[in-house]
Amino acid sequence: MSVPIIVTATFGDGDNGWLQELRRAHYPPERNQVPAHLTLFRQLPPSLEGELATRLARAAAAPPPRATIAGIMDLGEGTALRVESEDLEAIRAELAAAFHGLLTPQDRTWGPHVTIQNKVTPRIARTLQQQLRAGFEPRPLAIRALAAWRYLGGAWAPIRSWPFRR
C-alpha cells in the first residue's frame, strides 16, 4: 500500500502558537489530529520522496518566504485564514512544474490557507467567520520551514522538516 506524501509550510513560534490556539478553540477535537499548517501539496506519490527531499532542501536554503494572513475564507463546513505569499507561490510553482504529470487534480491548483475549523455545520462556520471578520486586519505570517509528512488516514507522520535559512 502506498502512503501519499503531504508537503506543508510550518510557522514561526509566535504564529504557530496563535494558530494552534485557534484550532484548539474551533476545530472539532476528534478531527484535530495534525498541527497548524499551510498545505502546498496534499498527495504526492511516495516514489518522489528522494527527489522531493532534494528540492525542498534547495528551496529552504533561501531566506524565509514573506507571507501575510490576508483574509477569512468560508470553507462551507469550516473556516480558514487566507494566506498571500508570492515567495511561497514561486516555491510551489517550481515543485508543481517538476512533478506536473504526477499531481492529483486537487494538487494542480492552489489556494493557500490555514484551516482553523472544519467539519462543522455551515451555521457554526458562518458565526466564526463573522466573529473573525469583525476585528480582522491583515498581518504578517512567519514561515519557518518546509515539511514532508506521510498521510496515515487522519494523522500524519513527519518525514522531515527543512528550516529556511535565517
Residue ranges and their predicted role:
Residues 1-166:
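Histidine-dependent nucleotide/RNA phosphoesterase domain, centered on the 2H-phosphoesterase fold
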